[in-house]
Amino acid sequence: FDPNFGWIKTGVAQPTLFITTEQELEEIQTMMLAFISNVDEDHIIYGNYVQDEEERVLEAAKIIGDSPLYVEVLPDFSLQDVEDKIKKNIREHDVKYIFHDYIHTSLKILEEISKKSGGIKLREDNILFMLSIRLKDLCNKYGVFIMSATQLNSDYQDSETPDQNLLRGAKSIADKIDY
């Protein structure tokens, strides 16, 4: 990326997986189109284009269509579901880069952990930490890059020195961050 010229085509496209956990495929596609075309999402949704926006959106759609980009939708997921989707896409598409949106609990994770722990209830921070560990383990096992995110608690608005204490649910997630 060049700040003066924007994205520069290098001719190299790496297989990439995007795992969405809260948004439908249609929402993700619209956001991708908006980002790549630099056209407001509402203009795309309602078809109200100005100047060359429609042409840019069509070009963005072509770029996305020609890209080795794969999207998996996991609205209610377990740790095993996430791992299975990652392994499937490594096997079928040789993905090297994975974006997981985002680290949070789900009913299926709670059920999975409860079964594995013999019914012992774990706190949310422990479960979130386990998910971050699993993602990091997959990076190391398969030699892939995984990026994820998590939410911040309400203290972020007043914090002068952002740190792991602002992570909602589990500041222990920060223990597994590499960047």
Model-predicted segments: where are they?
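Generic hydrophobic alpha-helical scaffold/packing signal
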Residues: 17, 29, 33, 83-90, ...
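Switch/connector loops and helix/strand junctions flanking conserved nucleotide-binding motifs
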Residues: 24-30, 38-39, 106-111, 155-160
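Cytosolic-facing regulatory segments adjacent to core modules
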Residues: 3-94
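Conserved nucleotide-binding/hydrolysis micro-motifs of P-loop NTPases
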Residues: 22-26, 75-78, 103-106, 146, ...
